[in-house]
Swiss-Prot record:
Keywords: Cytoplasm, DNA damage, DNA excision, DNA repair, Excision nuclease, SOS response. GO terms for cellular component: cytoplasm; excinuclease repair complex. The UvrABC repair system catalyzes the recognition and processing of DNA lesions. UvrC both incises the 5' and 3' sides of the lesion. The N-terminal half is responsible for the 3' incision and the C-terminal half is responsible for the 5' incision. Residues 209-244 form the UVR domain. Its main location: cytoplasm. Belongs to the UvrC family. The lineage of its organism: Bacteria, Pseudomonadati, Pseudomonadota, Betaproteobacteria, Burkholderiales. Coiled coil: none annotated. This is UvrABC system protein C. GO terms for molecular function: DNA binding; excinuclease ABC activity. It is found in: Cytoplasm. The gene is uvrC.
């Protein structure tokens, strides 16, 4: 049941609180613009939501949030576990400003064994299905590819695409070097290949000793039958497997699947390091840095006045915190930081595991605050999920290594942030841009890419909060111009990019004018919130002049326009900055910190533009002829490409081969053949 408070009525907390039930559920806070501020769960909605408005000593972070609340929505659930699941889904979908957020990494890599007659071993990202076998997830692409190399060396499973497999007439190089048994040409029977697949699967599941024992029995059986060549082949396979196991002896333990989670806080940031053990093999780790946690951690590290502030800093009930003697402020700060780390661990476990595969054991550096979370994970996984807080033996070594790696990753991040912030400051000073908070500095950079006028694309990349924001990158297909006219392309992309922003600001100003508010002030405020502070153009005086004309036509400030004229060979240090407002061109030199930022942004814009252009060009060249075929739609075209591996294979196919494709009749095959020849 969802209970919204209408946004067009004055916000009256007492009236809303009086209507809330004493039931479990999820609550959502909104500001005046309708943006979600916070999503939380509660065992008792009335008590939990009321605590935000009845306590007098809130932390600055929570107090600031409460002042911005303009609307409350609640959803009643049947249990606290159900509320936890709904809360996690809403946090991922809405990304509230005051919730601890982790990047939703849905594309964890897996090792896949396909459901083919001769299963293919492949690196895979995406959602899993029940048709194929999936092993993982793995912490990195490297871990998957290393496992594939091991399986190739020991079990010699195929890795080629089905379209290549179906068209082989002789073994490939992998067979010649002993990395594939060549099922494509019948060099191995179905039964023997199936045994290899089974052994590979058991190896990935941590049952290496079982596989080794069976191979030994198989070798002795061949020897007893005087089949010495087959026995030697199995012996070589055992030798390869023994080598792999020896190399991994330092990593192999008694556990099959374990995840190790270490949380470290320092310098206003938090790092969660996730190490994965799959099949008894330590596959490496990955560091995560949550957002929206900095303010809470700063409060914790700086000391919090009393228990209520400490509790609210991590959004926990005040009465859940221990009583601390007044003479132990150091302990208060330590406990506050630990509470934030526990809250971060809770958020990570919920956002990372709910809806995904969960190993049977989680080794953690901090005890999570929510007991319901573990119960929900066990229910979802279909097996008990154990949480180990104080591990022993090998697990303890793994946790210690994960904590050390978390500290190293956090120190590296803080160091990089410091140097990057210094470079941003140097750039702002070089361009005479005054700003109290450089984290708000937004830079957009444009580049044009094409091949002799073909497949022209423009790119726009964004630099904000001292780093590149890849989620805000945009590509623009350039049409209606003379091929190769970079000036016309630059005019088109700048007009398309900023014309809408100017229109939005004008509409907001007109609405305020009608309401009796100063529309010009609104227009300026709206424009400043939408537009970048600096616009970089990859080009010299000609491109900058075109940009100046566009900005003048749109009524925008031309002083924000800066051209980056590349030096000889695009070498960093030889660039010249060209200004649209008439300032003298500036050469920064190789040692300039400001130039490092400019070169980083410019090179990223060039990379983004050229990759898009190449993809567009390749698509046009590879599929244009098939798209022009009469009687061949998208599905038939896809089947042809899958069957023959590309346009070249389709062109080389005979009428009979074309007719063997599903959905292609003999008459249509003849028609296709005639159109392609």
């Amino acid at each position: 049941m969802t209970s919204p408070e209408a946004s067009d009525t004055p916000f009256e907390p007492k009236k809303i609180l009086a209507q809330l039930p004493h039931m479990p559920g999820v609550y959502r806070y909104y500001d005046t613009a309708g943006a979600v501020l916070y999503v939380g769960k509660a065992r008792d909605l009335k008590k939990r939501v009321s605590s935000y408005f009845t306590k007098t000593q809130l932390s600055p972070r929570i107090a600031m949030m409460v002042t911005r609340i303009a609307r409350i929505e609640t959803t009643v659930t049947r249990s606290e576990a159900e509320a936890l699941l709904l809360e996690n889904n809403l946090i991922k979908a809405l990304a509230p400003r005051y919730n601890i957020l982790f990047r939703d990494d849905k594309s964890y890599p897996y090792l896949k064994l396909t459901a083919h007659r001769f299963p293919r071993m492949a690196y895979y990202r995406g959602s899993v299905d029940k048709q194929n076998q999936y092993f993982g997830p793995f912490p990195s692409a490297w871990a998957v590819r290393e496992s594939i190399q091991i399986l190739q060396r020991v079990f010699q499973l195929r890795t080629c695409e089905d379209s290549v497999f179906n068209n082989r007439t002789r073994p490939c190089l992998l067979h010649q070097i002993g990395r594939c048994t060549a099922p494509c040409v019948g060099a191995i029977s179905d039964e023997d290949y199936a045994i290899d697949v089974s052994n590979a699967a058991r190896f990935l599941l941590g049952r290496q000793s079982e596989v080794m024992k069976e191979l030994e029995q198989k070798m002795h059986a061949f020897a007893a039958e005087l089949k010495f060549e087959q026995a030697a082949a199995v012996r070589n396979q055992m030798s390869s497997l023994a080598t792999v196991l020896h190399q991994q002896a330092i990593e192999v333990g008694s556990d099959s699947d374990v995840d190790i989670l270490a949380v470290v806080a320092q310098g206003g940031r938090v790092c969660v390091n996730l190490a994965m053990v799959r099949g008894g093999r330590h596959l490496g780790d990955k560091a995560y840095f949550p957002t929206h946690v900095e303010s809470a951690l700063t409060l914790a590290e700086g000391g919090i006045g009393d228990e209520s502030e400490l509790a609210e800093a991590v959004d926990a009930p005040a009465d859940a915190m221990p009583d601390l003697p007044a003479e132990e402020p150091g302990r208060a700060r330590s406990d506050a930081a630990a509470s934030v780390e526990a809250e971060v661990l809770d958020a990570f476990i919920a956002q990372h595991y709910l809806g995904n595969r969960v190993p049977p054991v989680l080794v953690v550096s901090h005890a999570p605050a929510s007991r319901d979370l573990l119960e929900l994970l066990s229910e979802q996984a279909g097996h008990k999920v154990s949480l180990v807080r104080q591990p022993q033996g090998q697990r303890r070594a793994w946790l210690s290594m994960a904590e050390q790696n978390a500290q190293i990753a956090l120190m590296r991040l803080l160091s990089e942030q410091g140097s990057q912030q210094a470079r941003t400051r140097a750039l702002a000073e070089t361009l005479s841009y005054e700003c109290d908070d450089l984290t708000t500095l937004r830079i957009e950079c444009f580049d044009i890419s094409h091949t002799m006028g073909e497949a022209t694309q423009a790119s726009c990349v964004v630099y904000h909060h001292h780093k590149m924001q890849s989620g805000e990158y945009r590509r623009y297909n350039i049409t209606g111009i003379t091929p190769g006219d970079d000036y016309a392309a630059m005019r088109q992309v700048l007009t398309r990019r900023y014309e809408k922003m100017v229109e939005q600001a004008a509409q907001a100003a007109a609405a305020d004018d009608a309401a009796g508010i100063d529309g010009e002030s609104t227009r300026q405020a709206e424009a400043s919130s939408l537009l970048p502070n600096i616009v970089l153009i990859d080009g010299g005086k000609g491109q900058v002049e075109i940009a100046r004309q566009v900005f003048t036509e749109l009524g925008l400030d031309t002083s924000m326009l800066v051209g980056v004229a590349k030096g000889e060979g695009r070498k960093v240090g030889l660039e010249t900055l060209v200004f649209a407002d008439g300032r003298t061109p500036l050469e920064l030199g190789k040692e300039s910190a400001a130039l490092m930022v400019v070169a980083q942004i410019r090179d990223e814009a060039h990379r983004f533009a050229i990759t898009g252009m190449r993809a567009k060009r390749a698509k046009a060249r590879q599929t244009s002829r098939l798209e022009e075929l009469e009687g061949v739609g998208a599905k038939r075209r896809q089947r042809l490409l899958a069957r023959f591996g590309g346009l070249r294979g389709v062109v080389a196919a005979s009428v009979e081969e074309l007719a063997s494709v599903e959905g292609i009749s003999h008459a249509l095959a003849e028609q296709i053949y005639k159109q392609l020849h």
